[in-house]
Regions:
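GHKL/Histidine-kinase-like ATPase module
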Residues: 108-116, 144, 151-153, 159, ...
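GHKL-type ATPase core
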Residues: 2, 9-38, 49-187
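Glycine/charge-rich, flexible interdomain linkers and switch-proximal surface loops
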Residues: 6-8, 59-65, 201-203, 265-270
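Mobile ATP-lid/nucleotide-binding loop of the nucleotide-binding subdomain
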Residues: 45-46
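Short basic (Lys/Arg) and small-residue
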Residues: 42
Length: 270
């Protein structure tokens, strides 16, 4: 429930959390020679982290397991530190290639476990990377863009605290908002004249035709402005152009409002 994102003076970025830590055990069913740790596989192979499991995919973004492996492949270097089960595991990559492998034998197979560099009572994962300047023409991180996105994530993941630090400018922001999407609407309407004090909020869950469960949250509050501000997210990922969920909401609201107008003969009064 605590995440720290730091932009360092060399324009590298580190992300530290206090979660369970990426699994570090060697995957004996790995086809690679030597057999690698689960963490190395997740950071070097596309689709290795795919979340084809309803519980895993309920909240988190991504699906096909390409995110962190792409970051690794597009970085000049990436350093992975995992604190798990009382040990500090470490592995370094350069342009996606593991460096200074640990090698051992197990059950007649060559294995490459993560290096253990210390003991600890803490837990969590730290990813520290520097974008590759030979691939990107601009590797400067914009504080405002990161700040806006991390604020969104703080609202969308109620109870999670996210801290953003910029060592280049000695700036820091703490995002620890409560209230979820309802609190997000309240934040967006700050300083605006709202037409109703209470924020409309609804949540529900329904099984799809494929048998998976889909949960939905909606929060709305009208203000006296002339333009609308509609934000849509699926598993924390913003949909700039909306989607079928927004289309369905608009259709349902139009139907309900028209019915209310007809039932109360408001159109005739107008």
């Amino acid at each position: 429930d605590d995440i720290v994102v730091t932009i360092h003076t060399d324009n590298s970025v580190s992300v530290v959390d206090n979660g369970r830590g990426i699994p570090t055990g060697v995957k004996m069913d790995d086809k690679h020679e030597p057999k690698r740790s689960a963490a190395e596989i997740a950071l070097t192979e596309l689709h290795a982290g795919g979340k084809f499991n309803q519980n895993s995919y309920k909240v988190s973004g991504g699906l096909h397991g390409v995110g962190v492996s792409c970051v690794n492949g597009l970085s000049k270097w990436l350093r992975l530190t995992i604190r798990r089960e009382g040990k500090v595991h470490f592995q370094e990559f350069k342009q996606g290639i593991p460096q200074e492998r640990e090698l051992a034998m197990r059950d007649g197979f060559a294995i490459s476990p993560m290096k253990v560099i210390a003991v600890t009572e803490k837990r969590g994962t730290e990813v520290h990377f520097l974008p590759d300047g030979e691939i990107f023409s601009n590797i400067d991180f914009h504080y405002e863009i990161l700040s806006k996105r991390l604020r969104e994530l703080s609202f969308l993941n109620n109870g999670v605290r996210i801290r953003l630090r910029d060592e280049r400018q000695n700036k820091e922001d703490n995002f620890a908002y409560s209230g979820g999407v309802k609190g997000f609407v309240e934040f967006i309407n700050t300083g605006k004249k709202t037409l109703h004090q209470k924020i409309f909020y609804a949540t529900g869950e329904k099984n799809s035709d494929q048998g998976s469960s889909i949960a939905c949250e909606v929060a709305m509050q009208w203000n006296d402005g002339y333009s609308e501000n509609v934000l849509c997210f699926t598993n924390n990922i913003p949909q700039r152009d909306g989607g079928s969920h927004l289309t369905g909401l608009r259709a349902a609201m139009t139907r309900v409002i028209n019915k209310y107008i007809d039932d109360n003969e408001m159109a005739k009064k107008a």
